[in-house]
Amino acid sequence: MPPRELSEAEPPPLRAPTPPPRRRSAPPELGIKCVLVGDGAVGKSSLIVSYTCNGYPARYRPTALDTFSVQVLVDGAPVRIELWDTAGQEDFDRLRSLCYPDTDVFLACFSVVQPSSFQNITEKWLPEIRTHNPQAPVLLVGTQADLRDDVNVLIQLDQGGREGPVPQPQAQGLAEKIRACCYLECSALTQKNLKEVFDSAILSAIEHKARLEKKLNAKGVRTLSRCRWKKFFCFV
Protein backbone atom coordinates (compact mmCIF):
# COMPACT_ATOMS: atom_id res chain seq x y z
CA MET A 1 0.00 0.00 0.00
CA PRO A 2 1.43 3.39 -0.95
CA PRO A 3 2.15 5.85 1.83
CA ARG A 4 -0.92 7.80 2.87
CA GLU A 5 -0.82 11.56 3.09
CA LEU A 6 -2.35 13.11 6.17
CA SER A 7 -5.08 15.68 5.75
CA GLU A 8 -4.85 18.98 7.60
CA ALA A 9 -7.59 17.88 9.98
CA GLU A 10 -5.99 14.53 10.77
CA PRO A 11 -3.53 14.65 13.69
CA PRO A 12 -0.10 13.04 13.28
CA PRO A 13 0.37 9.59 14.85
CA LEU A 14 1.69 9.55 18.41
CA ARG A 15 5.21 8.30 19.03
CA ALA A 16 6.33 6.58 22.14
CA PRO A 17 8.53 8.88 24.23
CA THR A 18 12.23 8.11 24.11
CA PRO A 19 13.41 7.05 27.56
CA PRO A 20 16.23 9.21 28.95
CA PRO A 21 19.68 7.63 29.00
CA ARG A 22 20.35 5.66 32.13
CA ARG A 23 22.70 7.26 34.55
CA ARG A 24 25.17 5.10 36.30
CA SER A 25 24.32 4.95 39.95
CA ALA A 26 26.99 6.46 42.14
CA PRO A 27 28.93 3.93 44.20
CA PRO A 28 27.82 3.80 47.84
CA GLU A 29 29.81 5.99 50.18
CA LEU A 30 32.08 4.11 52.57
CA GLY A 31 32.17 5.45 56.11
CA ILE A 32 35.30 5.42 58.27
CA LYS A 33 35.62 6.41 61.90
CA CYS A 34 39.08 7.61 62.93
CA VAL A 35 39.79 8.49 66.57
CA LEU A 36 42.82 10.50 67.68
CA VAL A 37 44.14 9.79 71.17
CA GLY A 38 47.10 11.11 73.13
CA ASP A 39 48.10 13.42 75.95
CA GLY A 40 46.65 16.90 76.15
CA ALA A 41 48.46 19.65 74.22
CA VAL A 42 50.29 17.29 71.84
CA GLY A 43 48.51 18.84 68.85
CA LYS A 44 45.64 16.47 68.03
CA SER A 45 43.17 19.29 67.40
CA SER A 46 45.72 21.16 65.32
CA LEU A 47 46.22 18.11 63.09
CA ILE A 48 42.50 17.86 62.39
CA VAL A 49 41.96 21.59 61.83
CA SER A 50 44.99 21.85 59.55
CA TYR A 51 43.85 18.82 57.53
CA THR A 52 40.15 19.68 57.25
CA CYS A 53 40.26 23.48 57.11
CA ASN A 54 43.75 24.11 55.76
CA GLY A 55 44.38 26.41 58.71
CA TYR A 56 46.11 26.45 62.08
CA PRO A 57 44.53 27.27 65.47
CA ALA A 58 45.74 30.58 66.87
CA ARG A 59 45.79 29.34 70.46
CA TYR A 60 45.46 26.13 72.41
CA ARG A 61 41.94 25.24 73.50
CA PRO A 62 41.42 22.02 75.51
CA THR A 63 38.96 19.67 73.83
CA ALA A 64 36.31 17.51 75.47
CA LEU A 65 35.11 15.73 72.33
CA ASP A 66 34.81 17.15 68.81
CA THR A 67 34.03 15.51 65.50
CA PHE A 68 34.90 16.56 61.96
CA SER A 69 33.77 15.00 58.69
CA VAL A 70 35.60 15.00 55.35
CA GLN A 71 34.82 13.29 52.05
CA VAL A 72 37.71 11.96 49.95
CA LEU A 73 38.00 9.78 46.86
CA VAL A 74 39.87 6.48 46.99
CA ASP A 75 40.31 4.90 43.55
CA GLY A 76 37.37 6.99 42.36
CA ALA A 77 35.04 5.81 45.14
CA PRO A 78 33.72 8.28 47.74
CA VAL A 79 34.84 7.75 51.32
CA ARG A 80 33.50 9.72 54.28
CA ILE A 81 35.97 9.89 57.16
CA GLU A 82 34.83 11.05 60.58
CA LEU A 83 37.65 12.41 62.71
CA TRP A 84 37.09 12.25 66.45
CA ASP A 85 39.19 14.62 68.53
CA THR A 86 39.38 13.36 72.10
CA ALA A 87 40.57 14.96 75.31
CA GLY A 88 43.78 13.68 76.85
CA GLN A 89 42.99 14.71 80.42
CA GLU A 90 41.99 12.10 83.02
CA ASP A 91 38.74 13.95 83.73
CA PHE A 92 37.44 12.74 80.36
CA ASP A 93 38.51 9.09 80.60
CA ARG A 94 34.96 7.77 80.81
CA LEU A 95 33.60 10.01 78.05
CA ARG A 96 36.52 9.22 75.76
CA SER A 97 36.17 5.46 76.07
CA LEU A 98 32.56 5.58 74.83
CA CYS A 99 33.71 6.31 71.28
CA TYR A 100 36.21 3.43 71.06
CA PRO A 101 34.18 0.26 70.31
CA ASP A 102 33.07 1.02 66.72
CA THR A 103 36.25 2.80 65.64
CA ASP A 104 37.86 1.71 62.36
CA VAL A 105 41.35 3.17 62.95
CA PHE A 106 43.20 4.94 65.77
CA LEU A 107 45.90 7.60 65.61
CA ALA A 108 48.01 7.32 68.77
CA CYS A 109 49.62 10.76 68.97
CA PHE A 110 52.57 12.07 70.95
CA SER A 111 54.67 15.20 70.62
CA VAL A 112 58.24 14.58 69.49
CA VAL A 113 59.34 17.32 71.91
CA GLN A 114 57.39 15.94 74.90
CA PRO A 115 59.06 12.66 75.91
CA SER A 116 56.44 12.07 78.61
CA SER A 117 53.71 11.94 75.97
CA PHE A 118 55.74 9.31 74.13
CA GLN A 119 56.05 7.24 77.30
CA ASN A 120 52.29 7.42 77.85
CA ILE A 121 51.62 5.68 74.53
CA THR A 122 52.49 2.34 76.13
CA GLU A 123 51.55 3.22 79.71
CA LYS A 124 48.12 4.70 79.03
CA TRP A 125 46.87 5.00 75.47
CA LEU A 126 47.50 1.61 73.94
CA PRO A 127 46.10 -0.31 76.94
CA GLU A 128 43.04 1.96 76.96
CA ILE A 129 42.44 1.44 73.23
CA ARG A 130 42.86 -2.32 73.34
CA THR A 131 40.57 -2.68 76.34
CA HIS A 132 37.65 -1.36 74.30
CA ASN A 133 38.73 -2.22 70.75
CA PRO A 134 41.29 -5.04 70.41
CA GLN A 135 41.29 -5.31 66.61
CA ALA A 136 41.23 -1.88 64.96
CA PRO A 137 44.53 -0.79 63.36
CA VAL A 138 46.68 1.78 65.16
CA LEU A 139 49.04 4.30 63.61
CA LEU A 140 51.74 5.87 65.78
CA VAL A 141 52.00 9.58 65.00
CA GLY A 142 54.71 11.97 66.16
CA THR A 143 53.32 15.51 66.16
CA GLN A 144 54.94 18.96 66.27
CA ALA A 145 57.82 17.73 64.12
CA ASP A 146 58.62 21.34 63.17
CA LEU A 147 59.81 21.89 66.76
CA ARG A 148 62.34 19.06 66.73
CA ASP A 149 65.16 21.43 65.73
CA ASP A 150 63.70 24.60 67.24
CA VAL A 151 66.42 26.30 69.30
CA ASN A 152 64.05 27.80 71.87
CA VAL A 153 62.36 24.46 72.48
CA LEU A 154 65.70 22.69 72.86
CA ILE A 155 66.84 25.31 75.38
CA GLN A 156 63.62 24.93 77.40
CA LEU A 157 64.02 21.16 77.48
CA ASP A 158 67.61 21.50 78.63
CA GLN A 159 66.87 24.11 81.28
CA GLY A 160 63.99 22.06 82.64
CA GLY A 161 66.25 19.05 83.04
CA ARG A 162 64.06 17.06 80.69
CA GLU A 163 65.06 14.68 77.95
CA GLY A 164 65.62 15.90 74.44
CA PRO A 165 63.26 15.25 71.52
CA VAL A 166 62.21 11.65 70.95
CA PRO A 167 64.64 10.07 68.45
CA GLN A 168 63.01 8.76 65.27
CA PRO A 169 64.59 5.28 65.56
CA GLN A 170 63.17 4.96 69.08
CA ALA A 171 59.69 5.89 67.88
CA GLN A 172 59.98 3.50 64.95
CA GLY A 173 61.02 0.75 67.35
CA LEU A 174 57.96 1.39 69.50
CA ALA A 175 55.69 1.21 66.45
CA GLU A 176 57.07 -2.23 65.66
CA LYS A 177 56.77 -3.33 69.28
CA ILE A 178 53.09 -2.39 69.58
CA ARG A 179 52.40 -3.69 66.07
CA ALA A 180 51.26 -0.34 64.75
CA CYS A 181 50.62 -0.10 61.02
CA CYS A 182 53.39 2.47 60.71
CA TYR A 183 55.12 5.41 62.37
CA LEU A 184 54.82 8.86 60.83
CA GLU A 185 56.01 12.28 61.94
CA CYS A 186 54.14 15.37 60.83
CA SER A 187 53.59 19.04 61.51
CA ALA A 188 50.19 20.71 61.62
CA LEU A 189 51.86 24.11 61.26
CA THR A 190 53.87 23.40 58.11
CA GLN A 191 51.59 20.52 56.99
CA LYS A 192 54.65 18.39 56.30
CA ASN A 193 53.55 14.73 56.05
CA LEU A 194 50.08 15.75 57.24
CA LYS A 195 48.27 14.31 54.22
CA GLU A 196 50.36 11.15 54.42
CA VAL A 197 49.16 10.55 57.98
CA PHE A 198 45.47 10.66 57.10
CA ASP A 199 45.96 8.84 53.80
CA SER A 200 47.61 6.01 55.71
CA ALA A 201 44.79 6.01 58.26
CA ILE A 202 42.13 5.81 55.54
CA LEU A 203 43.85 2.97 53.69
CA SER A 204 44.48 1.04 56.91
CA ALA A 205 40.81 1.37 57.86
CA ILE A 206 39.62 0.25 54.42
CA GLU A 207 41.86 -2.82 54.52
CA HIS A 208 40.69 -3.62 58.06
CA LYS A 209 37.01 -3.36 57.09
CA ALA A 210 37.63 -5.57 54.04
CA ARG A 211 39.26 -8.24 56.22
CA LEU A 212 36.36 -8.18 58.66
CA GLU A 213 33.83 -8.45 55.84
CA LYS A 214 35.70 -11.35 54.26
CA LYS A 215 35.85 -13.14 57.60
CA LEU A 216 32.14 -12.52 58.18
CA ASN A 217 31.22 -13.84 54.72
CA ALA A 218 33.36 -16.94 55.21
CA LYS A 219 31.68 -17.56 58.56
CA GLY A 220 28.27 -17.25 56.91
CA VAL A 221 29.20 -19.79 54.23
CA ARG A 222 30.42 -22.27 56.84
CA THR A 223 27.23 -21.84 58.87
CA LEU A 224 25.08 -22.37 55.78
CA SER A 225 27.03 -25.48 54.83
CA ARG A 226 26.52 -26.99 58.28
CA CYS A 227 22.77 -26.29 58.10
CA ARG A 228 22.47 -28.06 54.75
CA TRP A 229 24.50 -30.98 56.08
CA LYS A 230 22.16 -31.34 59.05
CA LYS A 231 19.08 -31.17 56.83
CA PHE A 232 20.54 -33.84 54.59
CA PHE A 233 20.83 -36.23 57.51
CA CYS A 234 17.35 -35.35 58.73
CA PHE A 235 15.85 -36.34 55.38
CA VAL A 236 17.79 -39.61 55.40
UniProtKB/Swiss-Prot annotation:
One MF annotation (Gene Ontology) recorded for this entry: protein kinase binding
Keywords assigned: Cell membrane, Endosome, GTP-binding, Lipoprotein, Magnesium, Membrane, Metal-binding, Nucleotide-binding, Palmitate, Phosphoprotein
Name used for this protein in its record: Rho-related GTP-binding protein RhoV
SUPFAM superfamilies per record: P-loop containing nucleoside triphosphate hydrolases (SSF52540)
UniProt source species: Homo sapiens
Expression across tissues: Highly expressed in pancreas, placenta, and fetal brain.
Subunit structure: Interacts with PAK2.
Protein's gene: RHOV
Keyword match Membrane: yes
Function, in words: Plays a role in the control of the actin cytoskeleton via activation of the JNK pathway.
One Pfam family, short name: Ras
